[in-house]
């Protein structure tokens, strides 16, 4: 469960290391975001010469949460930290060309097949 002010790790090579959620998109009073939801983030920590810089406001999709996700068979997939993949503000496609760490099968929608194909492991 991601809400405003939540700090997330970045699971791609866009140049951002750490981001903070500033808005959960989808509804006027929506409070929490789960895996597969799009959020608005600001870059808090970035590497030199990256594609994004500190202070940039971008969209991101949540790929891992500590809360986890429940499957229809009752299994719960949880992770050690919260992570997201930075998206282009207009096209909502990933800015980075590599994804680090596992992602869940819940991302298998038309919009996020690129993330699934780049990920080293899909749980």
From Swiss-Prot:
UniProt-recorded Gene Ontology molecular function terms: large ribosomal subunit rRNA binding; structural constituent of ribosome
Oligomer and partners: Part of the 50S ribosomal subunit. Forms a cluster with proteins L3 and L19. In the 70S ribosome, L14 and L19 interact and together make contacts with the 16S rRNA in bridges B5 and B8.
A Pfam entry, by short name: Ribosomal_L14
Family: Belongs to the universal ribosomal protein uL14 family.
Record protein name field: Large ribosomal subunit protein uL14
KW Membrane (keyword) present: no
Species, as recorded: Histophilus somni (strain 2336)
Gene Ontology biological process terms, A to Z: translation
Function summary: Binds to 23S rRNA. Forms part of two intersubunit bridges in the 70S ribosome.
Organism lineage: Bacteria, Pseudomonadati, Pseudomonadota, Gammaproteobacteria, Pasteurellales
Gene symbol of the encoding locus: rplN
Assigned GO CC terms: cytosolic large ribosomal subunit
Keyword Ribosomal protein appears in the UniProt entry: yes
Keywords: Ribonucleoprotein, Ribosomal protein, RNA-binding, rRNA-binding
């Amino acid at each position: 469960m991601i809400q405003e002010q939540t700090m997330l790790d970045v699971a791609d090579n866009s140049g951002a290391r750490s981001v903070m959620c500033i808005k959960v998109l989808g509804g006027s009073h929506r409070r929490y975001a789960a895996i597969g939801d799009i959020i608005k983030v600001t870059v808090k920590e970035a590497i030199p010469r990256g594609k994004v810089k500190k202070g940039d406001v971008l969209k991101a999709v949540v790929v891992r949460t500590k809360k986890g996700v429940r499957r229809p068979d009752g299994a719960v997939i949880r992770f050690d930290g919260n992570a997201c993949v930075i998206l282009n503000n207009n096209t909502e496609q990933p800015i980075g060309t590599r994804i680090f760490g596992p992602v869940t099968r819940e991302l298998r929608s038309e919009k996020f097949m690129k993330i699934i194909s780049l990920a080293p492991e899909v749980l």
